[in-house]
Amino acid sequence: MFEIHPIKKVSVVIPVYNEQESLPELINRTTAACESLGKEYEILLIDDGSSDASAQMLVEASQAPDSHIVSILLNRNYGQHSAIMAGFSYVTGDLIITLDADLQNPPEEIPRLVAKADEGYDVVGTVRQNRQDSWFRKTASKMINRLIQRTTGKAMGDYGCMLRAYRRHIVDAMLHCHERSTFIPILANIFARQAVEIPVHHAEREFGESKYSFMRLINLMYDLVTCLTTTPLRMLSLLGSIIATSGFSLAILLVVLRLAFGSQWSGEGVFMLFAVLFTFIGAQFIGMGLLGEYIGRIYNDVRARPRYFVQKVIRPASSIDIEENH
């Protein structure tokens, strides 16, 4: 029987990228939600290479009187999950909550996640109710969730929602993973003994635009497929066997038809032969593309370049210049 450790301190990790319009409300609402917990807390805001005034606003927030905000400034944009991992490196709490900066997931839900984690869960996920996103975003999210469920066997309903709570030992385990492509909700579930999901409210985006374009969603799907499983490689082997068998069978059939109906029939089947040829070539290109994705990821991991580069950390009581590679 595992001992359930009480939650004494809560750390909230929020990646920020060009969110200057939403930052004042985000900070106020998140601080109010944490104050209502009756526990120690800290709010870690990670600037992921913003080109607007977000970084300066974070510095000012950390230096404000009675601030609980730790600002972490990355030297450029590394992506949402790398920014969160940077925040994980500086947390001091027993429970770590991740939250997006766009306020679509209300910070007021934080006490509910803490209460659920207090029941002994390692990971508390969330499911967005009445999603206020476009049809394309919702459809893409459903496809990604189904893909993840099938490849991982974990019956979590909404992997795309970043409003989640993790026990400290889960975060420590994730920090020991050094692969370049990281999808935090999936990685956390690999180490979690007990995980649960709760429904949460989902609001419309009031400020700015979504940072996930069509191409970024496509890249995310490629990342998920290639970092989760080697099943596509096995499927390629199976597909190759099927195509080879079909091609051999078709060749035998064409020989028989040629002998039975003469050369005239053979000439009339030229277009079918081209169609079959293009089908095989297309299958080869698909296979080469998937193999290239895996080889590219192996290459990136072998180079062992830093996942992110922390330029500066500003704590409530002092400003500390740090240059770190992770």
Swiss-Prot record:
Subcellular location field: Cell inner membrane
Span of the signal peptide: none
InterPro entries: ArnC_tfrase (IPR022857), Glyco_trans_2-like (IPR001173), Glycosyltransferase_2 (IPR050256), Nucleotide-diphossugar_trans (IPR029044)
Keyword Transmembrane helix: yes
EC number: 2.4.2.53
Pfam families (alphabetical): Glycos_transf_2
Transmembrane segments: 236-256, 270-290
Periplasmic side: 257-269
One GO term (biological process): lipopolysaccharide biosynthetic process
Top-level taxon of origin: Bacteria
Keywords, ordered alphabetically: Antibiotic resistance, Cell inner membrane, Cell membrane, Glycosyltransferase, Lipid A biosynthesis, Lipid biosynthesis, Lipid metabolism, Lipopolysaccharide biosynthesis, Membrane, Transferase, Transmembrane, Transmembrane helix
GO cellular component: plasma membrane
Catalysed transformations (reactions): UDP-4-deoxy-4-formamido-beta-L-arabinose + di-trans,octa-cis-undecaprenyl phosphate = 4-deoxy-4-formamido-alpha-L-arabinopyranosyl di-trans,octa-cis-undecaprenyl phosphate + UDP
PANTHER family linked to this entry: UNDECAPRENYL-PHOSPHATE 4-DEOXY-4-FORMAMIDO-L-ARABINOSE TRANSFERASE (PTHR48090:SF3), UNDECAPRENYL-PHOSPHATE 4-DEOXY-4-FORMAMIDO-L-ARABINOSE TRANSFERASE-RELATED (PTHR48090)
Main function: Catalyzes the transfer of 4-deoxy-4-formamido-L-arabinose from UDP to undecaprenyl phosphate. The modified arabinose is attached to lipid A and is required for resistance to polymyxin and cationic antimicrobial peptides.
Name assigned to this protein: Undecaprenyl-phosphate 4-deoxy-4-formamido-L-arabinose transferase
Organism, as annotated: Escherichia fergusonii (strain ATCC 35469 / DSM 13698 / CCUG 18766 / IAM 14443 / JCM 21226 / LMG 7866 / NBRC 102419 / NCTC 12128 / CDC 0568-73)
Gene that this polypeptide is encoded by: arnC
